[in-house]
Design a protein with these regions (language model features):
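Membrane-embedded beta-strand positions of outer-membrane beta-barrel proteins
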Residues: 19-23, 49-51, 87-89, 101-103, ...
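Residues on the lipid-exposed face of transmembrane beta-strands in outer-membrane beta-barrel proteins
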Residues: 6, 33-39, 87-91, 134-140, ...
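Structural signature of Gram-negative outer-membrane beta-barrels, strongest in the C-terminal barrel
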Residues: 193-203, 207, 211-264
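Outer-envelope beta-barrel architecture signal
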Residues: 15-19, 31, 43-47, 83, ...
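N-terminal periplasmic accessory domains that precede
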Residues: 1-22, 31-36
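Residues that define the transmembrane beta-barrel architecture of outer-membrane proteins
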Residues: 24, 29-33, 79-83, 128-132, ...
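Flexible loop and strand-edge segments within Gram-negative outer membrane beta-barrel domains
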Residues: 56-62, 72-84, 90-149, 154-180, ...
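Transmembrane beta-strands of outer-membrane beta-barrel pores
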Residues: 23-27, 53-57, 105-109, 154-158, ...
Length: 264
């Protein structure tokens, strides 16, 4: 099982805050400043904020060979600009239960240089990406035998592709896609005796997809996952088993609605 957790602020020597600023640079207009701030808001509360920016021209040189003709060219439409920010709040309650809250944002705009075509250096394809999510996790240990963990998350993804060319109607092609996800999860861990662990988890998802394509179904999907897990360890012997129940239903604004799916 892979478990990844955000790094929590660590304050040493009685400090209540920590700041870090970094700037990196390189060829072809590359520059990447970033900042980090850790702040202690109270005896049981900490905050971390990270932000960064990246830009580059990307117009690197290359040699183009066309029979006996050799020319020195530069890559066009290779620029990129990205912005990224993240904030995390960590709190420990008096009963030792914990609450972690995260908010994350990413935005980028970049050119797509395309293929190298003789006598036609034109490249005007552009791509924009945006991602935002916020999530919260609560964990409480009631006793050495019982532990509860609950999570909630909202995730938003958006991208836009645009190309300008005479081959398109009105001289431009624009594609826009947006996906959103709403997620809830709760899990209970029970350890009745040493070496034996029983857990029950329930996950629920709502996923939406919207595009500007004509007659797009723009589906909405509802998903439910229920998992019962048992694990036993005795010395070097490890036994585990999992039972998962899945239910998925969908709605569409155009076209045929898929059948519900159930699996155990």
């Amino acid at each position: 099982v892979l478990s990844i957790e955000t790094e929590k602020p660590v304050f040493e020597n009685g400090k209540s805050s920590l700041s870090q600023i970094q700037i990196r640079g390189g060829a072809f207009g590359y520059i990447a400043p970033s900042i980090r701030r850790w702040q202690k808001l109270g005896e049981h509360t900490g905050l971390s904020v990270d932000a960064s920016f990246i830009r580059a021209d990307g117009n690197y040189p290359f040699t183009l060979e066309n029979g006996k003709y050799i020319t020195q060219e530069k890559r066009n439409n290779s620029d990129i600009h990205t912005w990224q920010g993240e904030a995390n709040l960590f709190h420990t309650f008096h009963d030792e239960s914990t609450l972690d809250v995260k908010a994350y944002y990413f935005y980028s705009e970049r050119g797509l240089p395309g293929a190298v075509i003789l006598y036609n250096p034109k490249a005007e394809e552009r791509l924009w990406d945006e991602n935002f999510f916020t999530q919260a996790r609560y964990k409480k240990t009631f006793s050495p035998k019982w532990t509860l963990q609950a999570q909630a998350k909202f995730n938003h993804s958006w991208n836009k592709y645009e190309d300008t060319d005479v081959k398109y109607e009105n001289g431009k092609q624009t594609d826009i896609n947006r996906q959103d996800e709403y997620y809830l999860s709760a899990a209970v861990l029970y350890q009745p005796v040493k070496g034996l662990e029983l857990s029950l988890a329930q996950d629920g998802f709502i996923n939406t997809l919207h595009t500007n394509i004509n007659d797009s179904p723009n589906p909405v999907r509802y998903s439910s996952l229920t998992a019962l897990n048992a694990r036993y360890q005795w010395g070097r012997i490890k036994l585990s088993g999992t039972l998962v129940g899945t239910f998925i239903t969908e709605e569409v604004k155009a076209g045929n609605t898929p059948d519900d799916r159930k699996r155990l």
